[in-house]
């Protein structure tokens, strides 16, 4: 496989997010279609990846999206904007296929409480922490994947499209503010990033109850 490829057209940030969610769908190695997927077409294979049948060894391919993911992000750089405005990390926790990426401007001076170090841990559950909230929804989806994941996908696409639209307006406001007061622009973008991240986790917590 190549380390990188040059696309023949501009790639949208939402498309790159979807690249992160691949399980080889639509190929001969589609993990939702082989016997290991079971009746609910689950595209995940629990470790170990290799197994033996009748003395012959086999191995599952590793998909891009996996269940043991801590976090992923898509980095977006817009050269036509001031550096403080032009850089965004679209950040998500847990399995990329089920996460929702939200925009964290690169100039942000703090992170949302739901994503902050010390708010829960790998051994300490709290429904105020983004990872645990997303992990609950994702683990539930694994049990009946072809019935539950489409619901996640619909919600995911709606939120990410909404955030992309928000960013267009925030960019304009931040650029205008940046020209007058750099510190105020950075605080404006930090507030937007933190409020968006915290609100997302509140939304996803409610979604788990759905």
Predicted regions mapped to residue ranges:
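C-terminus-biased signal that marks the final domain/tail of proteins
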Residues: 1-210
